[in-house]
Each structure stands twice: as C-alpha cells, then as structure tokens.
C-alpha cells in the first residue's frame, strides 16, 4: 500500500532486474516517480525521480528496440490531461530519460492517454488507450503501434470498447492482463439529484 499527500492512480507495475517496480500516476507532484516493492503488494520504497517538472498522467513503460520507452500524457497550461502524448527513451528503466525529438508525438483526445500496459500480440505491439472524445471514461481503444523509434511514432486504433449492458458502471479506465486473465476497471458516475 502506498500512501502519499498527492493524488495517486494508474499504478503501472512491472518486473525488471529481478524486482517488482511501480510508477503510480501522481501528476500533482510534478514528477514521475519509481518505487520498488519490498513486500509486494503491500510494501514500497521510493527509488528514484524519473522525470521532474512535468505534469504527466498514466506513465507507461515499454522495452522495445534495445531501449526503454516511457509514454505519458502531458498537461501544459490549462489543457487536458488526456490529449497530448509525449515519449521519452532511455538505455535503462531508471534513465536517464531523453524526450522524443518530436514531442508531443500525438495530439488526439481519442487515443493519446494510456489505458494499461502495452502488450505484444500477433507480432505487433498493442497499446490500450482511453477514448475521451465523449468524456472521461467513455470508451477504451486498442491501438496498434506502427512505428516507435527515435525519429517517429505512429499508431492506429483498431478497436473501440464501450461500456455495455452487462457493465455495472458507466465509465471504462484501464485494460490489463495477468495470470491468464484480462481485467477492465472503471467507475460509475453518480447521479446528481436536484432538490427543489
């Protein structure tokens, strides 16, 4: 359990170097922080600040092409948390991180924000994304990464998932897989009752 004074969400958990690591979203801190599990999943210790001076959401790491890649949506000024995708690359997941030369690599409220770990499928990379065109949590998408290198980034959304009749909530947030299972999390938008 990790408790801090700032907002925490989207715990990106991964294994590397024989350890379990986590990068939680904590955009209010202005940093992207790395934690190491001391007693998974209950105990965590702060290991490093990966990036400082950035208001970023849903940082997601991927090892690809001999490098580590960090995907995150960056909020600049009064903009959205969901529409501007930035990339960084590094020789190791601890850094040092170099911003992609074409940041932001994508401006699209329908597919910039991450919705879970990137997975290898059918010889390609699939990136779960949040489709916020109709509001936060309106839908998820599955984007195939077409190009990822130091010169360019490209993706194509191939599938969209919306909350259906069997979904108890009204919003979708994250798609993840572990142990042969796939998980989708979301929330229910509370109805506002007008008093009169």
Give the residues covered by each predicted segment.
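Carbohydrate-active catalytic/glycan-binding domains of CAZyme proteins
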Residues: 1-196
